[in-house]
Amino acid sequence: MVVESSSSPIIPGLTDDVAELCVSKIPRSSFQITSQVCRRWRSFLRSQHFAAVRKLTGTVEEFLCVLMESECGRDVYWEVFDASGNKLGQIPPVPGPLKRGFGVAVLDGGKIVFFGGYTEVEGSGINSTTVSASADVYEFDPANNSWRKLAGMNIPRYNFAFAEVNGLLYVIRGYSTDTYSLSNAEVYNPKTNQWSLMHCPNRPVWRGFAFAFSSKLYAVGNGSRFIDIYDPKTQTWEELNSEQSVSVYSYTVVRNKVYFMDRNMPGRLGVFDPEENSWSSVFVPPREGGFWVRLGVWNNKVLLFSRVCGHETLMYDLDKEKGSKWRVCDQIKPSASQLASVLINF
């Protein structure tokens, strides 16, 4: 029997720096097999150094991470798909109790950040509950397949708008404990692991959504026709009259356009072009047995997930040469109801 040594070469006959470049070319869909080659390979594939080598050689891959909820609503877990639609397994659940009204974003291209939300606490009355907002923030690093707790927000909040702009994470408005409406915002700097409170226009809106465009933060409040635009360079807000009021419950951004599901437009997918300040919509195929509930993005295409577990996912093809159209996405088949999805590069 050959005993492995920690100093054994990654590939016999090659220096480790050359061998690392070779191994970094292996697609992640093959990691389960290649990690069984030897202990040295397994250790290298799971290391932060391996992730750095892949980034250096430009061999990072894009993965769709889907947060799902079981039918009973008690179990929440993540499933991961690669660019070909291969299901690569699950990532560990977010620490702490199950939350609603949370935010999920991606920083540094490959780290998932889960922040805020609320839990329900039983009240003293019959069938009564109170809402407890959370300021907790957790970060998932795919290099070591684990979560770690980051600095918490200054104010616990849920049902807020959020977006990443130039590497910084912004959360806007929302609600705190006892459904107290918030009229401020916060910004997180991952380099310093600090949150800073910031002013934002006070609008009586219900959640809404936010996105980045031209290095600026766009905040759209449900029930308001005004869009608040924040310029990080000048640290100032400006107001844009979009001339349309929305009630958005799910959205995604593809090719600098915002696609959204609006309670006021059943059977339609809304489209907002921030460059033209124009609104439009496209037909959404009806779904027997339930409503479309969440949007996502994969391979530069809009994904439409069903509320009902086991039903297929639809994909909206934005390729103008082929003509935009809906078709069934056979590759992406989540095993439960989708709550959120993000893309990471790793």
Curated annotation (Swiss-Prot):
Give me the Kelch repeat coordinates as residue ranges.
62-109, 111-167, 168-215, 217-257, 259-300
* SUPFAM superfamilies per UniProt: F-box domain, Kelch motif
Q: Where is the F-box domain?
A: 9-56
* InterPro entries linked to this entry: F-box-like_dom_sf, F-box_dom, Kelch-typ_b-propeller, Kelch_1
Q: Does the keyword Cytoplasm apply?
A: no
Which keywords describe this protein according to UniProt?
Kelch repeat, Repeat
What Pfam families does the record point to? F-box, Kelch_FKB95
Protein's UniProt name: Putative F-box/kelch-repeat protein At1g27420
Which species is this record about? Arabidopsis thaliana (Mouse-ear cress)
